[in-house]
């Protein structure tokens, strides 16, 4: 739930669902520009001079009961939304604006009521707002990094049956062990970067665009002009939240059977519907399309056209030649293998290229920084508010920086506490995890924990330069290395998937916390309050997210199955990666490996071309990561997203100012309303209440057969 500037690396972060582990993926440039424009006149004076007369509360007073009550409420809301997105397509847009707006609205309403009754003891400050933002990001982020749509669900028998490798080991979800696993692995990353906070934020002056933009959002809320706009945005969000919720409620009445309802409307005809080209009336993905950059939506649509419009129909003609003609459509020895492994090849190619690119930037930037203290890292990073090269005579820079640095260094977190916490949690985790996963030997875990601080630093440093977390890439690296080390005969698949979870949680939370330190630095929030808020939010997420997943798991018996409401596509992808790591490529159908190599190379080539072209032309090159998603799922959600883009495009042409101010609020309302409908729909399913009507679309010929059958049976 972070915001930042628009760039190709961050565009990928929005679409690869794993890269939402930076909290939530960054917002687009239009949202950032909106906040900058709102604050433009104020910043001419200096941001901190605006707040100079307001007392900065101590770190303990920043941690209020009302802040954590609001955070808990919002965490439940956003956990449902993220879980639904995780289990449908895996595309999780930035919900940062929603969290910031709703957090501001709830506490502001609370304090206003107390003020009228004469019971208000502490005003609502930007520091408290930052605590809420941090807590909600940490909590609902577990709904993603917990692996409910990836590595964790990929261990289940339901996913293993689709992959045809049940014998390789399964571990079905259970509320007890999932909560225990998350508590064991989710806190370690927080301690790994605490000693480096001053180096990252003050000495290296890393910009962390998402954290900086989030701070701008919060600062703007607490100015008179920003508060007025925030109230209007909340009203708009609430209006479209209600519209989206009741639209989902209305659609539910017509889903009383398989492939029933508006979500199966054959918009472009039945033949196109067969290849998943249709508009499914999803308010969620229309909203996602309004938030995601245009190039993301176009890339996803192009990927859908390339795969479902061209490749899969052609490969289907090779049935009986390239693969057996008697295997079911879901078999990994048939067409399904091409869908999954070609998508995996593109994801790995794109991930490998960008891993090398970000790592090279990280190492070169670090080398330059260590060589000379006067050399600024900002040459290879994004500049939002701070300019390390600014003249020391600049009153704005000197005053703001001095005040922020003074408050940032005021509350120190002892190094012994961070080191001791890391060692204690690592030792506890090393002892407990082998009992949860007997395939994951204690020495595998020990190796991960020895390497983790270095990788966590690299990830946090790289995020400061590029605003892009590579946690999912480190997780995939763990799948292959630990899986191959364990071997096929010793449970390598489960060991690799479990190791993926351990690694992802460490490096993900490390970059998240460093982003939060940057946000806290710019809002004068104490590092101690940021750390405590992150810990409490993570603890909330370790309980809330498994409970939300469990509700989905118990309510929908077809969860994780292809062509259902919740196919959980990346669970199959992650298990396929683990299978590839322990078995090699011998089990793939004919020509599948050749196609995988080809698309792996094409993904790297497209990235090279995109980065080598001038930004004016490179921004038109599609993103391989985005193109890979519909290879497995189909292009129906891409059509929804493009509809969202079209709505926003027309709105910007008609009234650009209102589109900038309220576009994200409208999109967030659409996403939140449809997402929260998952709660009552799950409860209805558990209670055995079924929709009363099945609205299904048939061809004329099929309809005649059905009519004749019904007449004959009367």
From Swiss-Prot:
User: Where is the chain membrane-spanning?
Assistant: 67-87, 90-110, 135-155, 175-195, 236-256, 295-315, 340-360, 413-433, 445-465, 477-497, 531-551, 593-613, 631-651
The record's keywords, sorted A to Z, are: Membrane, Transmembrane, Transmembrane helix, Transport
Give the bilayer topology. Answer: Multi-pass membrane protein
UniProt region (Disordered), positions on chain: 17-44
Residue ranges that the Swiss-Prot or TrEMBL entry lists as coiled coil: none
Which terms in the Gene Ontology molecular function aspect does this entry carry? oligopeptide transmembrane transporter activity
Q: Where is the signal peptide?
A: none
Return the Basic and acidic residues bias intervals.
27-36
Entry's InterPro entries?
A: OPT, YSL-like
The UniProt function text for this chain reads:
May be involved in the transport of nicotianamine-chelated metals.
For this chain, the family text in UniProt reads: Belongs to the YSL (TC 2.A.67.2) family.
Output this protein's name: Probable metal-nicotianamine transporter YSL5
The species is Arabidopsis thaliana (Mouse-ear cress)
Task: Identify the coding gene.
Answer: YSL5
């Amino acid at each position: 739930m972070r915001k930042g500037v628009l760039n190709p690396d961050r565009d990928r972060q929005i679409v690869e669902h794993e890269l939402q582990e930076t909290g939530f993926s960054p917002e687009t440039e239009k949202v950032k520009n909106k906040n900058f424009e709102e604050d433009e006149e104020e910043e001419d004076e200096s941001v901190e001079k605006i707040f100079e007369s307001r007392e900065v509360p101590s770190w303990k007073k920043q941690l209020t009961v009302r802040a954590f009550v609001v955070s808990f409420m919002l965490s439940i809301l956003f956990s449902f939304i993220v879980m639904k997105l995780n289990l449908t397509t895996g595309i999780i847009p930035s919900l940062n604006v929603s969290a910031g707006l709703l957090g501001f609205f709830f506490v502001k309403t609370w304090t206003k009521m107390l003020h009228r009754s004469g019971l208000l003891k502490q005003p609502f400050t930007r520091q408290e707002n930052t605590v809420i933002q941090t807590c909600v990001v940490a909590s609902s982020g577990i709904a993603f990094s917990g692996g409910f749509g990836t590595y964790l669900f990929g261990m289940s028998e339901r996913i293993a049956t689709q992959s045809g490798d049940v014998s390789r080991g399964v571990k079905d979800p259970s509320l007890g062990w999932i909560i225990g696993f998350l508590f064991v692995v989710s806190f370690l990353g927080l301690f790994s970067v605490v000693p480096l906070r001053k180096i990252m934020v003050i000495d290296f002056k890393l910009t962390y665009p998402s954290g900086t933009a989030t701070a701008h959002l919060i600062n703007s809320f607490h100015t008179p002009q920003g508060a007025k706009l925030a109230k209007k945005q909340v009203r708009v969000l609430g209006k479209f939240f209600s519209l989206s919720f009741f639209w989902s409620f209305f659609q539910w009445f017509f889903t009383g059977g398989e492939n029933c309802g508006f979500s199966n409307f054959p918009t472009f005809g039945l033949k196109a519907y067969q290849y998943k080209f249709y508009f499914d009336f999803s308010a969620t993905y229309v909203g996602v399309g309004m938030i995601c950059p245009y190039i993301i939506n176009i890339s996803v649509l192009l990927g859908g056209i390339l795969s479902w419009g061209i490749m899969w129909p052609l490969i289907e003609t090779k049935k009986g030649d390239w693969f057996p003609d008697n295997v079911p459509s879901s078999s990994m020895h048939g067409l399904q293998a091409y869908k999954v492994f070609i998508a995996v090849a593109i994801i790995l190619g794109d991930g490998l290229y960008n891993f090398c690119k970000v790592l090279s930037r990280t190492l070169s930037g670090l080398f330059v920084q260590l060589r000379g203290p006067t050399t600024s890292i900002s040459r290879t990073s994004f500049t939002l508010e701070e300019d390390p090269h600014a003249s020391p005579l600049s009153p704005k820079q000197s005053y703001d920086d001095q005040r922020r640095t003074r408050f940032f260094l005021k509350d120190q977190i002892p190094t012994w506490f961070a080191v001791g916490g890391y060692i204690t949690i690592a030792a506890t985790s090393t002892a407990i995890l082998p009992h949860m996963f007997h395939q994951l030997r204690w020495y595998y875990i020990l190796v991960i924990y020895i390497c983790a601080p270095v990788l966590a630093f690299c990830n946090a440093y790289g995020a400061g330069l590029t605003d892009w977390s590579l946690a999912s890439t480190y997780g995939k690296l763990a799948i292959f290395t630990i899986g191959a080390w364990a071997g096929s005969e010793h449970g390598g698949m489960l060991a690799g998937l479990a190791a993926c979870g351990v690694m992802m949680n460490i490096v993900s939370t490390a970059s998240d916390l460093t982003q939060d330190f940057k946000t806290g630095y710019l809002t004068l929030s104490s590092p101690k309050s940021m750390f405590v808020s992150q810990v409490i939010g993570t603890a909330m997420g370790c309980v809330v997210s498994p409970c939300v997943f469990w509700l989905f798991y118990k309510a929908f018996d077809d969860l994780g199955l292809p062509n259902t409401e919740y196919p959980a596509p990346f669970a199959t992808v992650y298990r396929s990666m683990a299978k590839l790591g322990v078995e090699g490529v011998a089990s793939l159908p004919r020509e599948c490996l050749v196609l995988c190599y080809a698309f792996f190379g094409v993904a790297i080539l497209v990235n090279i071309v995109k980065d080598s072209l001038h930004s004016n032309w490179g921004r038109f090159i599609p993103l391989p990561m985005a193109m890979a998603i519909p290879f497995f799922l189909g292009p129906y959600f891409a059509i929804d997203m493009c509809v969202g883009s079209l709505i926003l495009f027309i709105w910007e042409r008609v009234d650009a100012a209102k589109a900038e101010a309220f576009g994200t609020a409208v999109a967030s309302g659409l996403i939140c309303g449809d997402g929260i409908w998952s709660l009552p729909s799950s409860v209805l399913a558990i209670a055995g209440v079924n929709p009363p009507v099945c609205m299904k679309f048939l061809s004329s010929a099929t309809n005649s057969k059905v009519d004749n059958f019904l007449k004959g049976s009367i």
